[in-house]
From Swiss-Prot:
This is Chaperone protein Skp. Homotrimer. One of its GO terms (molecular function) is unfolded protein binding. Pfam families: OmpH. Keywords: Chaperone, Periplasm, Signal. Residues 97-108 are annotated as: Lipopolysaccharide binding. It is found in: Periplasm. It comes from Salmonella typhimurium (strain LT2 / SGSC1412 / ATCC 700720). Molecular chaperone that interacts specifically with outer membrane proteins, thus maintaining the solubility of early folding intermediates during passage through the periplasm.
């Protein structure tokens, strides 16, 4: 009787694990993120958003470099002292604006990245629910997967569109 119960329990465990394996899928999040970012034009949006400020910084840098070259060729005098103060002030202003620019650009980039991640996660959940999948794992974190594991990357990409 004990052997029969043990065999029945083992058989039930194998059936349960086989059913669980059918409900696992993988998705390539890196690939999805890259493709969705290209399709939505996030990089172009960010580039256009910061184009004016980047041009202003480039102009300031060019102007500062020309003043520094003039300063190097000048001899000591009141004009040189005035130009030195102007260059120091402009260098400080440039550094502050450049730092603010980088900070704003990084913040906006993170905002857009988070929006994309949210869209992708929502699509993954929808595809998983539609296909009765219990567990979805990022393909990049899996050391090995058999050919039995379903890859839903293409389905998720269609859903995100």
């Amino acid at each position: 009787m004990k052997k029969w119960l043990l065999a029945a329990g083992l058989g039930l465990a194998m059936v349960t694990s086989a059913q669980a394996a059918d409900k696992i899928a993988i998705v390539n999040m890196g690939n999805l993120f890259q493709q969705v970012a290209q399709k939505t034009g996030v990089s172009n949006t960010l580039e256009n958003e910061f184009k004016g400020r980047a041009a202003e910084l480039q102009k300031m840098e060019t102007d500062l470099q020309s003043k520094m070259q003039r300063l190097q060729s000048m001899k000591a005098g009141s004009d040189r002292t005035k130009l030195e103060k102007d260059v120091m002030s402009q260098r400080q202003t440039f550094a502050q604006k450049a730092q603010a620019f980088e900070k704003d650009r990084a913040r906006r980039s993170n905002e857009e990245r988070n929006k994309l991640v949210t869209r992708i996660q929502t699509a993954v959940k929808k595809v998983a629910n539609d296909q009765s999948i219990d567990l979805v794992v990022d393909a990049n974190t899996v050391a090995y997967n058999s050919s039995d594991v379903k890859d839903i990357t293409a389905d998720v990409l269609k859903q995100v569109k």
